[in-house]
Amino acid sequence: MEMLRRSSVFAAEVMEVFDRSPTDKELVSQSKVLCRDYIHSRLHRAGIGWSKPEHGSGGTLAEVSSVLLWLGDELEYLRPNVYRNVARQLNITIASENIVSDAFLAVAAEIFSTEYSRKGLEKHKGVTWGKIVSLYAVAGALAVDCVRNGHPAMVHTIVDCMGEFVRKSLASWLKKRGGWADITKCVVSTDPSFHSHWLVTAACACGHYLKAVVFYLLREK
């Protein structure tokens, strides 16, 4: 009986972990792991040798990482030239950590600046999964630029910036959706309208990114 009681207690504790909402700290930490995975994938695709992250994603987060990469591929396929040569588009010197972080955070803020509303959902400050994938695509492309030009240390700067932006601007939105695992609905849903909505938000994300680049360049003049 004692063993059964302990098993029940353990099972309850495990279920509590899965049922509870993720904390801001957990969401930020997971966002950085996902960013490392995304950057590693893009560096590998570009033919740049790069060691796999020591603390890579596992379990549910590994599935999220796979979906994020798949959606990133789809987004980049829609607009193949948008997420390349990001440093050149922004006209920044990637040798400076401050410039790289400032540019990334400025573009991120502009991507998510547009108000967004959809029937049945609350109005939120421009957050969609399409825009989040767009931000990761920017991070991956910028990291490739940095490493290619001899500044691999900037990868850590970009990852830290991603975590900072998630903490300040995306954590509450993610928490309302139960965490990062919600992104898997973009590919597992059998509702054609859901996938159609994803393609629309992804296409819009490209537009918001291009607008962000223009605003950043105008700000620098």
From Swiss-Prot:
One Pfam family, short name: Bcl-2
Motif (BH4): 32-44
UniProt note on tissues of expression: Strongest expression in ovary and eye, weaker expression in gut, kidney and brain. Little expression in liver or heart.
Record keywords, A-Z: Apoptosis, Membrane, Transmembrane, Transmembrane helix
GO-annotated molecular function: channel activity
Residues in coiled coil: none
Compartments where located: Membrane
CDD domains the record matches: Bcl-2_like
Residue positions of motif BH2: 173-187
Family note: Belongs to the Bcl-2 family.
Purpose of the protein: May play a role in apoptosis. Does not appear to show pro-apoptotic activity when expressed ectopically in early embryos.
Protein name per its UniProtKB record: Bcl-2-related ovarian killer protein homolog A
Organism: Danio rerio
Lineage start: Eukaryota, Metazoa, Chordata, Craniata, Vertebrata
Gene that encodes the chain: boka
